UniProtKB/Swiss-Prot annotation:
Function comment: Hydrolyzes ribosome-free peptidyl-tRNAs (with 1 or more amino acids incorporated), which drop off the ribosome during protein synthesis, or as a result of ribosome stalling. Catalyzes the release of premature peptidyl moieties from peptidyl-tRNA molecules trapped in stalled 50S ribosomal subunits, and thus maintains levels of free tRNAs and 50S ribosomes.
UniProtKB keywords: Cytoplasm, Hydrolase, RNA-binding, tRNA-binding
Binding site for tRNA: 15, 66, 68, 114
InterPro entries: Pept_tRNA_hydro, Pept_tRNA_hydro_CS, Pept_tRNA_hydro_sf
Localization per record: Cytoplasm
Record EC number: 3.1.1.29
GO biological process: protein quality control for misfolded or incompletely synthesized proteins; rescue of stalled ribosome
Gene name of this polypeptide: pth
Catalytic activity: an N-acyl-L-alpha-aminoacyl-tRNA + H2O = an N-acyl-L-amino acid + a tRNA + H(+)
One GO MF term: tRNA binding
Name assigned to this protein: Peptidyl-tRNA hydrolase
HAMAP family: Pept_tRNA_hydro_bact
Site keyed Discriminates between blocked and unblocked aminoacyl-tRNA: positions: 10
Chief place where the protein resides: cytoplasm
Length: 189
């Protein structure tokens, strides 16, 4: 069996450590202890790394398209590697959740997230596993775009690092147990 873990974000150094790139940050945290390195694949428009966990091939992906076109890379990789959408996990930011809160879901709408909208449009289903990481709402008077493209302040970064550790544990549990339901029971709350 093959699984694909996708972290959403925007490419380029100016977007590193921004709220919208928390999906990239989560994937980077996941691969840190697995001795996985990323290679840029221009054909698939993604940074791709892989390893085996319990005899199962796991692809870690960071699309190099901008957020709104994430579905291009996801669809191309699912097709090329013949991976079912049931074996897809997407990690992304959610501004409707408090900073650092995480929630695993089995399926659902895009909830206004353009990266998820793109994935749903390109793969033709809402039925794929996901991890949402809360980045909070913009402060009064700040636009959503400025909020998601802004960096975390020091206190929020501490909270996000704790959340990234929790996401790391949740994804590893998910890969061991091979069950989103069990993982949701263990980590949602």
């Amino acid at each position: 069996m093959v699984k694909m873990i996708v972290g959403l974000g925007n490419p380029g150094s100016k977007h590193q450590q921004t709220k919208h790139n928390v999906g990239f940050m989560a994937v980077d945290r996941l691969v840190k202890d697995l001795d996985v390195s990323f290679t840029e694949d221009k054909t698939f428009k993604a940074l791709i790394g892989s390893t085996f966990i319990n005899q199962e091939k796991i692809y870690f992906v960071k699309p190099t398209t901008f957020m709104n076109n994430s579905g291009l890379a996801v669809r191309a990789l699912l097709t090329y590697y013949n991976i079912s959408t049931k074996d897809l996990m997407v990690i992304y930011d959610d501004l409707d959740m408090a900073v650092g809160k995480i929630r695993l879901r089995q399926k659902g709408s895009a909830g206004g997230h353009n990266g998820i909208k793109s994935i749903i449009a390109h793969i033709g289903t809402q039925e794929f596993d996901r991890v949402k990481i809360g980045i909070g709402r913009p402060s009064h008077g700040m636009s959503v775009i400025n909020h998601v493209l802004g960096k975390f302040d020091t206190d929020d970064m501490i909270t996000i690092n704790i959340a990234l550790d929790k996401v790391d544990k949740a994804i590893n549990y998910y890969l061991q147990e091979k069950s989103i339901e069990k993982t949701m029971q263990q980590f949602n709350g």
